Structures are given as C-alpha cells and as structure tokens.
Amino acid sequence: MSKLDEDVQKIGDKLVFNPYNTNNKEITTQEIKNILKQYGVPCNIYNDKLYKRAFVHKSYVKKPLLENESENILVVEKPHNCLPLSTKSNERLEFLGDGVLECITKYYLYRTYPKENEGFMTEKKIAIVKNEHIGRIAYEMGLH
C-alpha cells in the first residue's frame, strides 16, 4: 500500500478514498460559546453552522461522485462510528479570516508605530500573521 496524497491510497491496483476518522467529532454550540466566553468575545450565535464549518478540514469533505468515477477511485463506506463527510470545508472561511486578521494587524501596527515606515511594519505584520505563529496560538487555545 502506497500513499498517493492525503486521502487517496493505492491498495493493489485500486485507488481507495478513505477519509474517515473515529476521532473526529463535531464541535457543539455550547463548546463554541465556551471558547468565545473564555477569550472575552461577546457574541450571540445566530448561525452555528459557520462556526462548525470553521473546524472542518478539507480532507473530511465529500469528493464529487463524478470525480471519483472518472479517476476510478473506490470510496469507502462510512463506518457507523464516524461523522458523515461534510459538503464544505473551512478553506473559504480561512481565506476570509486571513484577510480580517491581516487588516487588524496592519491597523494595530500603524497605530503602535506612528514613526516607522511601511517596510518595518510589513516585516512585523509578516512575523505576526505567519501560519506557524497562528498555529501555535490556536494550539495554545485548544483549537486543535
């Protein structure tokens, strides 16, 4: 068995898509509220689906049937103890969030360093918003 990419494996002469993971669980609305409260974010949740989607990795999303058939990929049936695959991942929300985070960071740096030039602020912004830094913060917050 050889790994072709994150979610498709070659088993013998067949390609098999098996994204299921018994450790995956859907975040509850109460867990979302607890996280927001813990970090002092005043928020009424009107659409918990957006918050829940923020926790869906692209590897846990349904592959279109035609894509699987055209590539001759066998899709494993969902085990009884696993969440069903999602129709959407967090990718688009991540794109939007990255833009918001960058905007807030730029504003903060602009106000904090009024005498510095844009090159200085750009270097600081890059250091603050890089994935490793944000990943570490998310891990420390328990968002892993």
Regions inferred by a protein language model and the residue ranges of each:
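RNase III-family endoribonuclease catalytic core
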Residues: 2-144
